[in-house]
Amino acid sequence: MTVSLHARRVARFPLFRATRAAVLSALVAAGAAHAAVLTPEQTTDLYLGTFVNGDVAKAAQFNDAMRPRFDGKDALDVAAIPTLGDTMRDNMIAALLSKMPAKSRAALRAPISASIASYQHVLARSECRATGSTQKPNEYVEGESIATVDFSCRVVDVEPGVKALKEKLGNPRLKTDKARTAFLAAFFSGMAHVYDEAPMGRPVTGQVDLYGTNEKGWLTGSPGDVLSPLVDALLGPIGSAGGEADK
C-alpha cells in the first residue's frame, strides 16, 4: 500500500495528532533556513538526508551549497542535528504522557519511551529520494517560483505487526484508569517490538514546496514537510491505540 499525506488520520486520533505535532515542531528551529544554488530535487534530497536520516554530512553539504547566498554563513545549524533526535524524543514522550491520566504517567513513561526510541531507529533507516518537480509562479513574490517536489521513501512495514499485537491484546472495555494504564503499557511495549522487527519495504510518497528560482536556488521554511508522510506511516498505529484506550 502506498501512503501519501492524509489529514484524516490526524483528525481521528488525538494521541497521533499530539505525537505528530511534537515531531514536526522540533524541526522548526533547526530547519528554518534559506537556500541557494541547488536544483529543487537536490535541495529536497539534502533535506531528506538531514531531517529523516539525521545525516550531518548532508547538512554540511547543504550549507556548502547555500553559503554564497548567505554571505559565507551557514544556513542550517549543523551542531543541532545530532541532538535533534533527543529533542524530538522528549517532545513526543511529553505529548503522549500529557494525554494520560496523571496517576498513570509514571507507569507509562518507560513503555512509551521504548516505543519512541524504536520508532526513531526505524525512521532513520528510511530510504528516500526526490523523484521530480514542477514549478509555477509565486503570486506573492514577483520573479520567484514555487517548486513542488515529489519524493518517495521505503520505510518499515508495521501494519502486520500492529495487527498481530491488537489481536493479542484484544478489544477490552477499559472502564478504569488501572485497566487503561495496563492496556496502554502493553501496547507501547508491544509497539517497540513491532518497530524493531518490522521488515523494510513499505512505499511512501510525499511532496514538499520549495521557494526560489533556478538561478538563486530553493528553500523551505518548513522542513518538517518531508517527514509528514513517514510520520503518518510509522506513528499512525500509536494514534490508533489512543482510539482503543478511549473506549
Task: Label each PLM-derived region with a short phrase.
Residues 17-20, 187:
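Prokaryotic Sec-type signal peptides and long signal-anchor helices
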Residues 88-176:
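Surface-exposed, charged secondary-structure patches
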Residues 36-114:
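Core segments of small alpha/beta cavity-forming domains
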Residues 12, 142, 243-247:
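A short, highly charged, low-complexity intrinsically disordered segment
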Residues 1-17:
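N-terminal secretory signal peptides that target proteins for export/translocation
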Residues 31-35:
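Sec/Tat signal peptide C-region and signal peptidase I cleavage site
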Residues 161-247:
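Low-complexity, intrinsically disordered terminal/linker segments enriched in charged
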Residues 19-30:
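Bacterial N-terminal signal peptides
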